[in-house]
Design a protein with these regions (language model features):
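A conserved beta-strand-loop-helix scaffold within acyl/acetyltransferase catalytic domains
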Residues: 154-205
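Acyl-donor-binding surface of acyltransferase catalytic domains
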Residues: 56-137, 151, 257-259
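Conserved acetyl-CoA-binding loop-helix of GNAT-fold acetyltransferases
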Residues: 60-67, 198-204, 208-221, 225, ...
Length: 266
């Protein structure tokens, strides 16, 4: 498959994940206008307060509608544009007063195709046991690990991982245990032929033991078993080498634009 096709699958999956998990947040709002989507919450994490171009033929008015909605809520937010595909909207954001962020300005969107069975086999260290979450105790463990691993406030995990997701088709939540203690989290989100890999976080005391790679491989393997032949994710620069060893390659780069006048979360 051409990288442009993989980029489309990555983008569709990310939006499906974002708009899906924020249903766990009571004050979340997902609005669509003119081919753009605004995902807005009270959570202090910009993934869940952002505007994205969703459709071909998106309009400047649609993007600005999302920006206006975000400004009305008053929380910090970002707009992420795909380099190349969304370049036409840079001028729109500039006129609206948004600026490219200096810190963490880009996010690589990555895809693995075809999924290499050798790359994802035999990845779990012997002391790690990965379990699919089926109850509230598992949700609590997932939230605990995600909060510790990402260094975020507890409400972020609480607002994006909840019991209702356990009944959602295509969504699987995971926790990995070592010595009976939760040490690594993960979440898989399926859209068509793509399995999205999300919420890979390892607690500090369990890092550099291959647990994050093992969780990623498990999500990919379960996706293959469900009929997927493409895996997608959004990487940090720190995590990119780990994902590349599992067969992922960058297919799109997102550039982040922020609103200088938006207030900061307290």
């Amino acid at each position: 498959m051409h990288p442009s096709g993989l980029a489309v699958l990555e983008h569709e999956n990310w939006i499906a994940y974002l708009t899906g998990v924020v249903a766990c947040s009571p004050r979340a709002a997902v609005t669509r206008a003119g081919g753009s989507v605004a995902i807005l919450t009270d959570l202090p994490f910009d993934w869940f307060n952002q505007v994205l171009i969703e459709r071909d033929g998106a309009t400047p008015a649609g993007v600005l509608a999302g920006v206006d909605e975000a400004r009305k809520r008053g929380n910090p937010f970002v707009v992420r544009l795909r380099e190349g595909a969304d370049d036409a909207f840079v001028a729109t954001l500039t006129r609206a007063g948004l600026v490219a962020k200096e810190r963490d300005p880009t996010t690589p969107g990555m895809a693995a195709f075809p999924i290499d069975p050798d790359a994802i086999s035999a990845r779990a260290p012997g002391e790690l046991r990965i379990r699919r979450v089926t109850d509230d105790a598992g949700i609590d463990a997932h939230r605990l690990v995600a909060t510790a691993g990402f260094g975020t406030r507890p409400e972020v995990a609480a607002g994006t991982a909840c019991h209702d997701l356990l009944d959602r088709p295509g969504c699987v939540i995971y926790v990995g245990y070592a010595d009976s203690e939760p040490v690594v989290s993960g979440l898989g989100w399926r859209t068509g032929r793509a399995i999205g890999v999300y919420s890979i976080a390892t607690i500090a005391s369990a890092r550099r033991r291959g647990f994050g790679a093992a969780m990623t491989a498990r999500i990919m393997s379960d996706g293959v078993a469900a009929g997927c032949d493409v895996a997608v994710l959004q990487a940090s620069e720190l995590g990119r080498p780990i994902y590349e060893r599992l067969g992922f390659r960058t297919v799109v780069t997102y550039r982040t634009y922020g609103d200088p006048v938006a207030r900061r979360h307290g």
